[in-house]
Regions:
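Preference for protein termini
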Residues: 1-393
Length: 393
């Protein structure tokens, strides 16, 4: 794994970005640098890519087994779920509600590969990973004999086609919050476009414009048309706490992601996976509280069970009991009362003052590509940059 700099900018880079809907490429970081640059990339070997792909497939299979066990046992003590959320989880799992995609976040130092978390509900940077970095790979000059771990787009097409065949439905609604930024809507537009090319009739709307028809007992759009299939770039834990949430039970609407993914998008997963698979090579020791930690010399990352963009992350030193805010993490009262886990700190490599995190994508049940984000700190937050990758044999 190497960080390559000095790659020439494509003469028509801006035009290429805009043509694929990546109009937030120049979103600024705090230092004024842009979210995307043609000039930097990460180089991997084929052996490293094989390792990442194999780990992703193995961890996803472990997570699916984990969901099955959790539902079978019905032990949701650590999650702080409502009764309705428990019912939604169990109903969606019993009905084999299909899923679309997810993204593992990995730390990798060229030798050790460790799972940080599974963004199984509302992962973004999909457009960047599936389309933008592939376009870059095909057009950039000066990188001979390169390839990329990336067939995300093809797997999405296959998945949307399969969903249509299985459901027998024709229409698919795609929704996000009205006030969501261009990154969210850019990712949503991309998914809607893929679904359209797979044969679906597409409808876009804001989450706030979803209604419920008491007479037909169906979720409907602004035209009072039934919503049969809904992809929502809106967290399940939020949606399942709205006034319409009780209507999700026994609803004719198929939600993406399904409610059983509440078990994977919550960081309870990390502690329970470690308990179930102690010393697994791709897992970091993770516990629910400080008292369970036995490795006194390690630094531990205190993460909220529900949190996004590196919010509310702390470091804890077992040897002296000190706890302090992690550099690069912003505090949000929204996540302050969500509960926490303690995950052993993994030392990310420092390349020219930047810390990369690998996002490895799963579509359906298939590992199919990756993208990287790097930040000025070991906590990946709103200042991060998306960096393309390639590999050489």
């Amino acid at each position: 794994m190497k960080r390559i700099t000095g790659i020439p900018t494509r003469p028509n880079m801006v035009q290429q970005m805009l043509e694929v809907g990546f109009d937030y490429y120049n979103q600024p970081s705090s230092d004024g640098s842009h979210y995307w640059s043609d000039n930097v990339a990460y180089e991997f070997t084929l052996a490293e890519i094989d390792k990442i792909e194999e780990a992703t497939n193995e961890l996803h299979a472990m997570c699916m087994d984990f969901v099955a066990d959790e539902v079978k046992q019905g032990d949701y003590a650590h999650y702080r779920f409502t009764d309705l959320q428990k019912n939604l989880i169990e109903q969606s799992w019993r009905e084999n509600a299909p899923h679309l995609y997810g993204r593992f976040d990995f730390g990798y130092d060229g030798n050790n590969l460790k799972m940080f978390e599974y963004n199984a509900d509302t992962p973004t940077s999909l457009l960047e990973a599936a389309v933008v970095q592939w376009q870059w790979l095909e057009q950039v000059e000066g990188l001979p004999n390169r390839d990329q771990f990336n067939w995300i787009h093809e797997e999405l097409l296959t998945r949307f086609s399969m969903l249509q065949q299985q459901s027998g439905k024709a229409g698919f609604h795609f929704a996000a919050m009205t006030e969501a930024g261009r990154e969210d809507w850019g990712n949503l537009d991309y998914l809607a476009d893929v679904a359209y090319n797979a044969g679906w009739h597409i409808h876009r709307l804001s989450i706030e414009d979803i209604g419920y028809d008491d007479d037909t007992q169906q979720f409907v759009d602004l035209n009072n048309q039934p919503i049969e299939m809904l992809f929502k770039l809106y967290p399940l834990e939020w949606m399942s706490n709205t006034k319409y949430a009780p209507f999700m039970l026994n609803s004719a609407t198929q939600f993406f992601e399904p409610a059983w993914k509440l078990l994977l998008s919550n960081k309870v997963l990390l502690a329970k996976l470690w308990r179930k698979h102690p010393n697994h090579p791709y897992l970091l020791p993770t516990y629910f509280n400080q008292h369970d930690i036995t490795e006194r010399k390690s630094i531990w990352v205190k993460k909220p069970l529900l949190g996004r963009e590196g919010a509310n992350v702390f470091y804890y030193e077992k040897s002296n009991g000190l706890e302090f805010a992690a550099k690069g993490s912003e505090h949000s009262n929204f996540y302050a009362n969500a509960g926490y886990i303690y995950q052993q700190k993994f030392e990310l490599p420092n390349f020219d003052g930047m810390y990369p995190v690998i996002g490895s994508w799963v579509v359906g049940d298939v590992a199919c590509g990756m993208g990287l984000r790097e930040d000025f700190t070991a906590v990946t937050g709103n200042d991060s940059h998306f960096i393309p990758h390639y590999f050489v044999e």
